[in-house]
Amino acid sequence: MAQVEYRGTGRRKNSVARVRLVPGEGNITVNGKDVREYLPFESLILDLNQPFEVTETKGNYDVLVNVHGGGFTGQAQAIRHGIARALLEADPEYRSSLKRAGLLTRDPRMKERKKPGLKKARRSPQFSKR
């Protein structure tokens, strides 16, 4: 018999997370490692669990994540976005609570590109009067 699983893709900055939810005890595995081993800060782990708290499904699903690109914060928020989308696939009734918490919206903020003649996106070279 095929095991039930729900999939969701989350994105944030340059990070892309492919999330699979499987009925289980609430274990979160990111790129083959436990989430506490993979993410260095407790605040990121709390951020990542937000969709489960909003839908009151904490401990109902095991989460298997494949994430790449970006840094820790972008990856954690991409995982959060993916979990929210996968939960929506599991039960469409979660939509209103997830939407109210802002978990279904892809954060559009990206790094601004570097412009020619400047050191960074907006930082200009040091000005010398003489």
Curated annotation (Swiss-Prot):
Record field: compositional bias (Basic residues): 111-130
GO cellular component: cytosolic small ribosomal subunit
Similarity-based family: Belongs to the universal ribosomal protein uS9 family.
InterPro entries assigned: Ribosomal_Su5_D2-typ_SF, Ribosomal_uS9, Ribosomal_uS9_bac/plastid, Ribosomal_uS9_CS, Ribsml_uS5_D2-typ_fold_subgr
One of the protein's GO biological processes: translation
This protein's name: Small ribosomal subunit protein uS9
GO molecular function: RNA binding; structural constituent of ribosome
Region of interest: Disordered: 98-130
Record's keyword terms, sorted: Ribonucleoprotein, Ribosomal protein
Cystine crosslinks: none
N-terminal signal peptide: none
The UniProt record lists the keyword Ribosomal protein: yes
